[in-house]
Each structure stands twice: as C-alpha cells, then as structure tokens.
From Swiss-Prot:
Its EC number is 2.7.7.6. It comes from Synechococcus elongatus (strain ATCC 33912 / PCC 7942 / FACHB-805). GO terms for molecular function: DNA binding; DNA-directed RNA polymerase activity. Belongs to the RNA polymerase subunit omega family. Keywords: DNA-directed RNA polymerase, Nucleotidyltransferase, Transcription, Transferase. It is an enzyme of class 2 (transferase). HAMAP family: RNApol_bact_RpoZ. It holds the Pfam family RNA_pol_Rpb6. Promotes RNA polymerase assembly. Latches the N- and C-terminal regions of the beta' subunit thereby facilitating its interaction with the beta and alpha subunits. The lineage of its organism: Bacteria, Bacillati, Cyanobacteriota, Cyanophyceae, Synechococcales. This is DNA-directed RNA polymerase subunit omega.
C-alpha cells in the first residue's frame, strides 16, 4: 500500500538550491540527481513490497542534501 509523505515544497526548493550553490558545477549536480533518481526507480521496481510513495527525483534531492549537511552519514 502506498504511503503518502507530506513534503514542504519550500523546504525541498531550499535543499535543491543549496545543492546547486555548494557545488562547483551545476551540470554535474544535475547529472548526479538524475542518476540517483534512475537508480532509485530501478530499486523500487525490484522491491515492489517496499514502495516509498515519494518520487525518485525528490528522494534523490533529499538524500543528497542530507549527505551535504550531515557528512557523518557517509562516514566522513
């Protein structure tokens, strides 16, 4: 069953903007987001029982901004 997550659009825009501002190359960040979204989509297709209810692009932006703001997540 799909769960619905309430995402604040302003917060999401702020996180996406912070990714772009903190990068040296906007194009590179855009490609990273697209690759992660594509990977997330394929992972969801493999694990049909674990649907998140959030679009892959939004999920990629949230994950990447968390990694930027909290480097201890990725072991840094």
């Amino acid at each position: 069953m799909l769960q619905r997550f309430d995402l604040d659009s302003q917060d999401l825009l702020f996180k996406a903007e912070s990714l772009i501002v903190n990068s040296t190359n906007r194009y590179h960040v855009t490609l990273q987001i697209a690759r992660r979204a594509k990977q997330a989509r394929y992972e969801e297709m493999e694990n049909l029982s674990e649907e998140t209810g959030i679009k892959p692009v939004l999920r990629a932006i949230l994950e990447m901004s968390d990694e930027l703001n909290q480097p201890e997540i990725i072991g840094g």
